[in-house]
């Protein structure tokens, strides 16, 4: 039992560390009663370009946090176990590239949360599943991306006609 737990922690160190970090940040916000929203990405704002490194750590609320926690654990676990040799690089690139995409292509509002990281991890598994001809892996990734899309859709505010 201890050996299995040690193996899981070793294989999933980066996803577990990331999930710990996002929960720690939310805990800090609650305890200190300080919002860290100034660490959001502000598209095309060169003064805040380093927020590419901080925005995935900030979440609006616990629903937002949970909706990113589960996919990171699942997708991170898949990548860590199937792509052991490159998993750390994949996670790091997903983290940084998602920030660059939001900074370069984002709209007019600041962006927070790890959804970009989730989509990047899922996209990596989806594409590599097709390239390696592993349809189960590709379909699992597609399912997680699809389900996460509906979580994202719930965050978007839509004006209703009265």
Predicted segment positions?
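A detector for small-residue-rich transmembrane helices and their helix-helix packing motifs
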Residues: 2-162
């Amino acid at each position: 039992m201890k050996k299995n737990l040690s193996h899981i922690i070793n294989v999933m160190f980066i996803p577990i560390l990331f999930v710990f970090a996002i929960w720690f940040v939310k805990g800090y916000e609650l305890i200190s009663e300080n919002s860290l929203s100034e660490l959001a990405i502000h598209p095309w704002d060169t003064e805040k370009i380093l927020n590419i490194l901080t925005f995935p750590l900030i979440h609006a609320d616990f629903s937002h946090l949970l909706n990113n926690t589960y996919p990171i654990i699942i997708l991170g676990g898949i990548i860590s176990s199937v792509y052991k040799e490159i998993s750390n690089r994949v996670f790091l690139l997903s983290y940084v590239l998602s920030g660059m995409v939001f900074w370069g292509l984002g709209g007019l509002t600041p962006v927070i949360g790890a959804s970009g990281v989730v989509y990047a991890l899922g996209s990596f598994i989806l594409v590599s599943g097709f390239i390696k001809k592993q349809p189960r892996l590709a379909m699992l990734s597609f399912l997680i991306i699809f389900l996460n899309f509906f979580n994202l859709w719930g965050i978007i505010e839509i004006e209703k006609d009265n």
